[in-house]
Amino acid sequence: MIDWLYSYPPLYPGILLKRYKRFFADVQLASGEVVTAHCPNTGPMTGVSTLGSVVQLSKSANPKRKLAYTLELIQVHDNEPTWVGVNTALPNQIVKLALAKYLFPELGSYNHIKSEVVYGVDKKSRVDFFLTGSDTERPIYLEVKNTTWAKGTLALFPDTETTRGQKHLRELMTLLPQTRSVMLYFINRGDCTEFAPGDSTDPIYGKLLREAIALGLEVLPCRFDVTPEGIRYLGLAKLVI
């Protein structure tokens, strides 16, 4: 039996007909019914949101929700048929579970995990996770980036220009070397074995990432197996810089 880090609720298969206004997706269910689902990923989902793709939806039991269905998975065919997780609310939840289980040995020892800690030059940013251990160990500022775009087996981030992502890199650099700064790329599909910055979509981000690595930023490109049953950690992808 597979020990999933995260198990999906019952999912409903369908076909993606239309995606519009960032938050909406029209899906034809197996029954033939067409429903409008909430799309929790407002980005372009480059190479993923192809019309006609097989998708999986979750359904809320809350009668007050305007849209009962949520788009969770899209099947792509870059390599073999592969499920891609598109619910951007899940990566941080799953990373928190993985941190609690100490699944990332590269981070070393830590005793406390805090989420959404204020940091940055202007104190207007929040880092996803702040890890602390003994007084002799440097604290860890860890940022998570959901990664769904791929070319072959190479995962790429970002899939569009991200001034917010650029800001995060600049702020993590200011913390070095007094603390450890870690960028964790959550590769939300199981068919990728390598990771690289998406230079063609955001060359500034790629330049900043390389500068940050030279200053001591640690990069964890984390591979995850994603299925309609659940999500599990597969280990690190090879970093291609």
Swiss-Prot record:
It holds the Pfam family SfsA_N. The lineage of its organism: Bacteria, Bacillati, Cyanobacteriota, Cyanophyceae, Nostocales. CDD domains: SfsA-like_bacterial. One of its GO terms (molecular function) is DNA binding. This is Sugar fermentation stimulation protein homolog. Belongs to the SfsA family.
